[in-house]
């Protein structure tokens, strides 16, 4: 399967202007709910995003306003939510497996500090572990009635970053990270089958991958799994979370429980050389909207990685699984390179700047453009469309040409990608029409 990630299909900007790290997206009805790690105002912040308006996010509040008594606020990380068949929802999250003593908390409050000797001792003794909560609505309130975490490998440093995967037969699994890096221990990604209600484990954990490549540094984390093309694709984040070196990788697994192999020796999505782009992308999760796969992830604002007041913003990318190759690749990278050639006045290699109608018809008619045509050929299609737009007398006429280019043929995604890139880069005055047409095609 050839994996294409179209980074910033419409405008590449964040969909929520606030700190929103380790996102998880859940599609319910006409709304996409996105959850994140704790902030100063919420244990599990949640927002509602509308996929028909570029996933513009509206903050809703705290999905779990009350924590169980055995844990401690300020460390609720990497949430994931499963929509159960009975219409209820299960929230999985990482949280400390114990709280500091009441005396320690009182001392810290009197001294107006959040750390001290007792906190240092508590941080060494406690572990981040996984718990679960239930709600009747995706917005909560989620209630955790447990007496302790249900996944907690203390000897491995604990567990964080739960992600739900449901197999074709409806069996729920949780993939998660052993959190050893804070204790001088190795990290790894595991999968574990859950009971039918999702509230307990139903089998032993299976190790999927560890940190084995130079770009990963000393850790792998933030797992998420997608089934496509007869394989299970395990996406993960790696390297130091608070640096621009943080990036997203991928492994191909034979089953949910492995074995898994990494087909690349480099990240799938990483910090670019453009100082205007977000840095250190990670925390990726996936959702299906209208038959199209989208990836949500966070990224540091430029220059803010690891700074005291730095923010990780929320981004969404379009993903395509198609093609004859067994090795994933980024479509955005090759398209961007080809666009640079076009912008500089060069022709697209192997294709004329304005492909003839016969060639365009061949591309349009392809049932699977990603499998049958190269990225540069698709770009040529988009460039031709944009060139045609340049000769339009009015914006309305240009928008009609965009509409025609998108709707001709059987694969809207295969056309939307190059047309979107070309219009965005070469004739942005037609972006409003393009945006409207894409929304109409992808979501209605």
What are these regions (language model features)?
Residues 55, 200, 369, 394-395:
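A general structural signal for well-ordered secondary-structure junctions
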Residues 383-444:
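Extracytosolic low-complexity repeat regions of secreted or lipid-anchored proteins
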Residues 27-30, 189, 288, 358, ...:
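Extracytoplasmic/secreted proteins, especially bacterial periplasmic and envelope-associated proteins
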Residues 36, 67, 85, 93, ...:
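Sec/Tat-exported extracytoplasmic proteins
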Residues 1-348:
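Carbohydrate-active catalytic/glycan-binding domains of CAZyme proteins
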Residues 267-272, 279-281, 363-367, 382-384, ...:
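Short, local alpha-helical segments
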Residues 1-30, 346-394, 442-444:
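Extracytoplasmic low-complexity, Pro/Thr/Ser/Ala/Gly-rich segments
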Residues 17, 36-38, 73, 123-124, ...:
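Extracytoplasmic/periplasmic, Sec-exported soluble proteins
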């Amino acid at each position: 399967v050839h994996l294409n990630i179209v980074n910033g299909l419409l405008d590449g900007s964040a969909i929520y202007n606030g700190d929103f790290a380790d996102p998880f997206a859940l599609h319910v009805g006409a709304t996409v709910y996105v959850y994140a790690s704790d902030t100063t105002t919420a244990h599990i912040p949640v927002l509602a995003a509308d996929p028909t308006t570029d996933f513009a996010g509206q903050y809703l509040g705290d999905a779990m306003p009350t924590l169980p008594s055995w844990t401690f606020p300020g460390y609720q990380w990497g949430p994931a939510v499963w929509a159960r068949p009975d219409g209820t929802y299960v929230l999985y999250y990482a949280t400390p497996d114990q709280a500091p003593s009441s005396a320690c908390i009182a001392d810290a409050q009197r001294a107006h500090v959040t750390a001290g000797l007792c906190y240092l001792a508590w941080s060494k003794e406690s572990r981040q572990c996984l718990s679960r909560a239930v709600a009747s609505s995706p917005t909560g309130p989620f209630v955790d009635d447990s007496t302790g975490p249900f996944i907690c490998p203390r000897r491995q440093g604990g567990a964080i970053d739960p992600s739900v995967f449901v197999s074709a037969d409806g069996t729920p699994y949780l993939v998660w990270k052993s959190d050893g890096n804070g204790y001088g221990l190795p990290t790894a990604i595991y999968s574990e089958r859950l009971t039918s209600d999702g509230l307990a484990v139903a089998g032993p954990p299976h190790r999927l991958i560890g940190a084995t490549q130079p770009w990963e540094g000393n850790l792998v984390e933030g797992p998420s799994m997608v089934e496509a093309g007869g394989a299970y694709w395990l996406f993960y984040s790696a390297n130091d979370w608070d640096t621009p070196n943080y990036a997203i990788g991928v492994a191909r697994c034979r089953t949910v429980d492995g074995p898994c192999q990494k087909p690349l020796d480099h990240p799938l999505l990483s910090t670019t050389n453009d100082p205007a782009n977000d840095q250190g992308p990670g925390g990726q999760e996936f959702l299906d909207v209208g038959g199209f796969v989208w990836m949500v992830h966070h990224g540091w604002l430029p220059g803010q990685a690891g700074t005291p007041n730095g923010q990780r913003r929320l981004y969404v990318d379009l993903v395509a699984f198609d093609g004859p190759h067994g090795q994933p690749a980024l479509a955005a990278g090759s398209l961007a390179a080809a666009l640079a050639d076009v912008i500089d006045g060069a022709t697209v290699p192997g294709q004329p700047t304005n492909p003839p109608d016969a060639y365009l018809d061949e591309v349009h008619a392809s049932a699977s453009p990603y499998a049958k045509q190269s990225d540069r050929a698709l770009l040529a299609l988009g460039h031709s469309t944009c060139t045609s737009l340049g000769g339009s007398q009015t914006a309305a006429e240009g928008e009609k040409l965009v509409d025609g280019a998108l709707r001709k043929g059987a694969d809207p995604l295969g056309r939307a990608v190059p047309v979107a890139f070309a219009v965005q880069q070469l004739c942005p005055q037609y972006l409003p029409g393009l945006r409207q047409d894409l929304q109409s095609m992808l979501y209605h």
